[in-house]
Amino acid sequence: MIEKISGDTAYFEAALTSEDLADLLADVGIRLIRAWGGYRPSTADLEKLNDLFRLRPEIEFCATEPGQLVDLPELQRVSEAVSGCFGEGLSDLKALKRLRSLGLTEPNFTALPEYADTLEELSLSGRLSKKSGACLSKLTRLKALSLSGTTLESFACIGKLKLTSLYVYGNRPNSPAGLEALSSLRELRVKNNSSWTDFSFLTELRNLESLCLEYCAKLRELVPLDALHQLRYVRLGNCDNLEDIAPLRSLPENCEVFATGRKLLQAGIAYEYSPKTGVAEWCREASLNLPAELLARRRELS
């Protein structure tokens, strides 16, 4: 039975019923299902879930032990609770008819290209073997990549991929060199990074629509953004050493902007603007040194 639903995640600690499946099917907000509290799903549980995934392919399943995917051929989005849940050499993945999204904590995934003909989204976390990092270049259909606290040494291995989304959490790779090659990138998010000092690669990402830099400790100044004509969202959150936001002046008025950090607040130039609501009231009160053209921006007329 479904024990609880938290946000977009459903947890179950006992056998699933037909009523559970009906509830899950009707809940359009569910995005992830996983066993909880040490419960080991039965074949009957997995067969019920397989019926659900046939109808709701956007829902992800978190595997908790090897062998579970054998009964889930319709599953398209899967992650593992701990390393090893997909069997030796990721062999359990062969049971899936179409693998679209995969979350790995496995340090060695050199076998992944064998199962990745349809893989569009990949999330990696933790330590990676050197050979595993190198095999990323073979995932030619990949569109979205998430690196959370990994040990990837360089972005060179993804330079030829047609990625549209990239998320980097942590300090590795310790240089952004190679990111300038990702010309198809539309969304970039970097968080909790204290190693990158040079963000000039941003000027080459001409198709970028969303830029989010959070807790980037060594970001001191922005590069010119005027060549990024597709930008619609810029967030510079808690970048405490960022001293100036002058490049934001060149952004169009249909671009949502949030920029804050210790030095910006001290200088009275922290900034928040939405095309729908205009400049935030807290900004008008606290950021007395904002450039006049930023402060004067108005919301779009409805």
Which positions does each model-derived feature cover?
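Concave beta-strand-loop units of leucine-rich repeat
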Residues: E3-L25, G29-D71, Q76-L90, R98-A111, ...
